[in-house]
Amino acid sequence: MPTVLNGNAIREKFLQFFESKQHRRLPSASLVPDDPTVLLTIAGMLPFKPVFMGKRERPAPRVTTSQKCVRTNDIENVGRTARHHTFFEMLGNFSFGDYFKREAIGWAWELVTGVFELPPERLWVSVYEEDEEALVLWQEVAGLPPVRVRKMGADSNFWESGPTGPCGPCSEIYYDFHPERGEGDIDLDDDSRFLEIYNLVFMQLNRDSEGTFSELPRKNIDTGLGLERMAQVLQGVPNNYETDLVFPIIRKAEVLSGRDYFKADDQQKTSFKIIGDHTRAVVHLVADGVLPGNLGRGYILRRLIRRMVRHGRMLGIAGSFLPQMATVAVELMGGAYPNLLESRELILTRLATEESQFLQTLETGERLLDEILGRSEKRISGVDAFMLYDTYGFPLELTMEVAAERGLEVDVAAYEEAMEKQRERARRAAKTVDLTQGASLADLERTDFLGYRNVASKAMVKLVLFEGEPIERASAGASVQLVLDQTPFYPEGGGQIGDRGYLSGPDLLVRIEDVQKRDTVILHTGRIERGTVATGDSVQAQIDLADRRRSQAHHTATHLLQAALKKVLGESVQQQGSLVAFDRLRFDFSWPKALSQAEIQQVEDLVNTWIAEAHTLSQEVMPIDQAKARGALAFFGEKYGSEVRVIDVPGVSIELCGGTHVRNTAEIGLFKMVSETGIASGVRRIEAVAGPAVLEYLRLRDTVTRQLADEFKVQVEQIPQRVAALTSDLKQAQKQIDSLKAALATARAEALLGQAETTGGFRVLVADLGDTEPEALKSAAEHLLAKLGEGGAVVLGSAPAADKVSLVAAFGKGAVAKGLNAGKFVGEVAKITGGGGGGRPNLAQAGGKQPEKLKNALSEASSKLSGALGA
């Protein structure tokens, strides 16, 4: 039997083995890829996609990595199968035009049988059915008998990057858990017997747009060995979750829930596994700069967190528990991924905040479920059930359980249909790493950007687009997109909007309003003011210099702002987005709470101090490794090549940046923060102005304050006191109004006491209180019940708006003991008015949308009370 190894040892032995084969070890890339076509790093090869495409220089001829990955296309299988995960580590060895099939097969076999000591008789191999070379090599190099090398079709053993581009056959190594079953009638897809542990992709072909294959001039190797799967094999456990990579997290969930994983039923075990898996995913996502949100990768993180909370509740874990789970995961993986330790506080804060908000959302979901139950006559629709699950985290089982209590059923078939549609969307989104997307302008030569040194230049028109289609020429009045051979116009990027300006020629004037970059081509969008423009024309390109100066002042000010935030708040501040415009700047950053006025003042003062110190900026192009070694900040989501531009404000800030900047900070003049707000959980936004825009802002503010002073008939400096006085008066008036409404409701209630009827020894009162607001209606019901005593039963209704009904049921102890439940009672009555609701057995509220049916609802309430209490 092979030596038992822990997960860290497996990872290290793999990397050391390939280092001994002259591979360069590289660290894991971020889960947030440079590739804008992919939300998350879903494969070990993804960071090398530009290398495989020939768009970036290879970091070395041979490379080995342990790459962290997150996939959610099979999220419903997580915890239910032995080996599905959202987070996993892919160990890989890569060759960029260096070695090929023979070496890849030989080293793979040496690794699994020599280093990891897997018995050869337990290993099977698959090859692509047309790859005779691989079939022979497995027998020659590894000594495998032909019976244990299986030919398989393109679905499983031919790798494609997309409809066109690099592709090739692949070969997989499988571990046999049950060799005693013999070698006849073998199905490598039988998960109960075989586990795929190592995949070798031989990237040797290129497919063109007509589907024709040709040999690649430089053949590549892309491999992947799943760390969790190898750990399962070497540690002799029945599934990936019980390896030392995941099980310590599950152990923490055992402690918090008071349950034993090994004594749990199947559903409880699934919940334990989901929590163990998702904890690993969420700590890495947060550490890599992902924030919970409603779009893209932010939604993926939010969904994982909500699943954790839901499965924690299913295990009986009360209250907040995510930070405790995350602490175990950070300690478990921090040795291999030090950024987890560095981001520990950020991770715990983010998860605690999101968990707290979701627990509140769950309460909202419960109220929504009450409304759905209230308007459903026989069954809850599948659409509603899926909405409860997808938006509020309600499992189908919980919805069905609550519905059954009300005598309803759930349309499970429609629910499953909605779920399958979501799964299909996820599968389509994550099916492959597409190496060909975004190549629509690839046939054009790159546009040379001259804008760092020039504000004007001559240029030749290479392409004219009208409504997205290429045309030969366009005339005055047309809105067009133009591609030039060279340009001084800065294209929108890195948060900075594109330059504006003009293209001119003999009897030609084109006003340029927007400039964008598409791959290596720069598109100038504008309107032809005069003349005609055609492909091949020579034009003079001139940017609006005043606009450029404003935008570069704002861009440099943005760098200073980030440096000031890090100095005042701490290095954990991370940029989450930015906008650099002619008239303002906007900077989004990670921070869990609003800045105090003192912190805002500190940040603003620091920026203005650095401006006044007149720092001369350094703008250099250098290799990215050199830039990072100098401490230059790089940002998630930005695409960087092997050569990068570095903006250095000496002693203040150093960042990778392709934008335009002032030469000296003194050119900015002045910086003023306009606002600081929250835009999402854990994300703050600062809006500010710099340079001439500060004067415009101050003029506008001065105009507004003078108008307010005139309106209030006070001096400008007295405005705050006047506003405070008016606010105090308004609050006092509102209190008086609320008090009068409550008094009116109480008076109405007192007047109704005489209408109370005696039924079976109980005092019953059902009444309409006109347009009384819900809170006042509730107070009136409680007041009446107190007057009627423990044998009282009160149902009140009102129509506070044209499309709104409010209902309250308040029952004394005697009525409750008789079997009445205020929550169920008022919910049933509210259905008549097109609504629903619920609450406690003794006090509950409900609402409706049809005031014209309030009378019928109250009549029904009276009848139901008579029937229940008079018996």
UniProtKB/Swiss-Prot annotation:
GO terms for cellular component: cytosol. Catalyzes the attachment of alanine to tRNA(Ala) in a two-step reaction: alanine is first activated by ATP to form Ala-AMP and then transferred to the acceptor end of tRNA(Ala). Also edits incorrectly charged Ser-tRNA(Ala) and Gly-tRNA(Ala) via its editing domain. This is Alanine--tRNA ligase. PANTHER family: ALANINE--TRNA LIGASE, CYTOPLASMIC, ALANYL-TRNA SYNTHETASE. Residues 834-871 are annotated as: Disordered. SUPFAM superfamilies: Class II aaRS and biotin synthetases, Putative anticodon-binding domain of alanyl-tRNA synthetase (AlaRS), ThrRS/AlaRS common domain, Translation proteins. Its cofactor is Zn(2+). Zn(2+) binds at residues 555, 559, 657, 661. It comes from the Bacteria. Its main location: cytoplasm. InterPro entries: aa-tRNA-synth_II/BPL/LPL, Ala-tRNA-lgiase_IIc, Ala-tRNA-ligase_IIc_anticod-bd, Ala-tRNA-synth_IIc_core, Ala-tRNA-synth_IIc_N, Ala-tRNA_ligase, Ala_tRNA_ligase_euk/bac, DHHA1_dom. The keyword Cell membrane does not apply. The keyword Signal does not apply. HAMAP family: Ala_tRNA_synth_B. It catalyses: tRNA(Ala) + L-alanine + ATP = L-alanyl-tRNA(Ala) + AMP + diphosphate. Keywords: Aminoacyl-tRNA synthetase, ATP-binding, Cytoplasm, Ligase, Metal-binding, Nucleotide-binding, Protein biosynthesis, RNA-binding, tRNA-binding, Zinc. Consists of three domains; the N-terminal catalytic domain, the editing domain and the C-terminal C-Ala domain. The editing domain removes incorrectly charged amino acids, while the C-Ala domain, along with tRNA(Ala), serves as a bridge to cooperatively bring together the editing and aminoacylation centers thus stimulating deacylation of misacylated tRNAs. GO terms for molecular function: alanine-tRNA ligase activity; aminoacyl-tRNA deacylase activity; ATP binding; tRNA binding; zinc ion binding. Belongs to the class-II aminoacyl-tRNA synthetase family. Its EC number is 6.1.1.7. The lineage of its organism: Bacteria, Bacillati, Cyanobacteriota, Cyanophyceae, Gloeobacterales. It is an enzyme of class 6 (ligase). It is found in: Cytoplasm. GO terms for biological process: alanyl-tRNA aminoacylation.
